[in-house]
Amino acid sequence: ETGEKGEKVEFAATLRRLIRNKNYVWGVVAQFFNIGAQIAVWSFVIRYAMVQLDFDGVLASLGDSASADAVVNALRGIEPVAAMFYDGCEWFGLDDLLPRTAEQAGATYYIMSLILFVIMRFVCTVMMKYVRAYKILIGLALLAVIFCLGTMLGKGSFGVYCLMGISGCMSLMFPTIYGFGLTGLGNDTKIGGSFMVMAIAGAAVLTQIQGIVSDQTGSIMAAYVV
């Protein structure tokens, strides 16, 4: 195989060097679990919010003939952050984002989790001008653990807020782990980067395990132990 600059790339030799590089190997492992955690967190946000905030019970109390406005007003009274989101949607004319079902109400928290993820990406970018990236990474990882405990043990809005907080903590993870893992690889960077990207397979593995835990325990909260 030939690289971009015409040099010959020996795949087997490169692979052996990568395997012997502990920093790289642990980078791939970290990325595997990082991506797995991201998708596992986001995949169950809707169901988690539905259970913790009892959207099914709230809408059932309104009856089948409830109007769309009645549904939104009932959901607005459950939790203040979502209420502000609904107010914003109405202000900007984004009525399609207003929930009409319990699942759509849960999806509100999924949307807000993604918004928080994006906001925190920019916040972390600014922070890296003043704080070393690895320190921010460690801090966010520890904070994510605390939020995860809150997600598993918390009740109602508190648990939902903790779950959304995990999303914010994950914003810096992928690019930072990727950069640290490829540090010092030199000519092995291209192949090393491909394996780092392949670590996204963690999403397929951890979400399956999380689903099994949820089914076996009958608790979506317990599933976040994964």
Can you name each region flagged by the protein language model?
Residues K135-L149:
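Structural signature of the two symmetry-related core transmembrane helices
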Residues R20-S61, N73-Y109:
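Extracytoplasmic gate region of multi-pass secondary transporters
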Residues M152-C162:
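Helix-loop junctions at membrane interfaces in 12-TM secondary transporters
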Residues I209-V226:
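A membrane-interface helix-boundary motif in multi-pass transporters
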Residues G106-F117, M198-A199:
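Transmembrane alpha-helical segments of major facilitator superfamily
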Residues G3-G27, S67:
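Juxtamembrane intracellular "pre-TM" segments in multi-pass secondary transporters
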Residues I119-R132:
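Helix-to-loop junctions at the C-terminal end of transmembrane segments
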Residues S171-G186:
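Intracellular juxtamembrane helix-capping segments at the cytosolic ends
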